């Protein structure tokens, strides 16, 4: 890409970050690519983005684990009681008797959620031991070798089925958002990088202006002695020298502030010397097609997944409000149990155990409360649908505007480079003309201002080119240079300590 090769400022690039002893401490010389890579690797913003990804990953893992069989064991070992309790006799009288016993029990429990129906199926086995002290006491074992239990809601909302639809979208959304935020870290690095370049250029401009102002002031003093220039022009040049001193002080303070901002963002101690991108634009596109960018964005960006998730959550709320009109639950248990004074006997001559329960709750008079809840959910769904349509239009519009801005930026950069060259030539010509002839101070001031603005605009347009490019990458999650999706090894990232 010849355009960026021609338009870059004459600074030497380096293949790797290097530290050189300059001034009071070491200096870290960075190219733009190295700055972006460092920001993605060690900036605070990148660490926050990774933390959010890890949170979403483990939430996804917890959801998947919730669908798998769960095995649990519970026990009480021991349970000792020595107390008096009330006892009702056969004739209806109540007396207090002394209880003195030692109990042990344990159970193994396996449960599985049934997502198609929303119920829970479990298998349980347990053993209880009781030792009664005192006269007539002894040992007693009670076993439950196996018991099968089903708990099933009927006509209710199937939360498992809805979560099975929504949770994968949440995780996919988190992955896409992480990739977008990674590109946004690059965008922030680009802005801070070029802000420092621009601040350094402003210092250079201020020093050049001060040097030229002092030269012109000396020339004006000589001309004043010869009577070829007015006292007013000499005073104006003296004022220009003072203003140039002030501008240099301000620009140096601004450069230090920009230096600190980039160092803090990259989490480095050394002074940073940014290298203006020279030749790094080779291979990047000069023109992007809106339909192609939009297609990649709709496929990869978190926005598309967010729209589907929000629509599904709105449907879920409506379904839950409708299911809240009545509640019916089925509970069924089948198994075997045995009792004996010895452990082996507790597993012989087993007796069957069956429990069936159907519980229901039907509102008779609620004064329209449940109907109101359903209407609220339906209204909220309509609001969400309207918001999603509006946001989809804005999403497409923003991509169109950004694509047009990027496509126009190459021409803007070419114009800025040419304007910088012309403004510098005009400035030099005016300075030499003043030294050897006569030219108004207004012309010199105007040439100085135009030269300064053109040089800064040249850097700004180069900044916009890179910023727009990475902004399109962050939206489409597509590497336009390599022609492939922007991806990451999520499993490796989240498991990195």
Placement of each model-derived feature along the sequence:
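Hydrophobic h-region of N-terminal signal peptides that target proteins for export
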Residues: 3-12
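Acidic, low-complexity, intrinsically disordered peripheral segments
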Residues: 11-25, 72, 79-84, 270-276, ...
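Regulatory alphaC helix of protein kinase catalytic domains
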Residues: 21-36
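Periplasmic alpha-helical coiled-coil/stalk elements that build and connect Gram-negative outer-membrane
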Residues: 30, 165-171, 175-296, 405, ...
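A small-residue-enriched
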Residues: 37-155, 187, 268, 294-372, ...
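Amphipathic alpha-helical coiled-coil segments
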Residues: 48-63, 181, 185-206, 215, ...
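Interdomain signal-transducing alpha-helical coiled-coil linkers
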Residues: 160, 164, 367-370, 374
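Metallo-beta-lactamase
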Residues: 251, 302, 384, 461
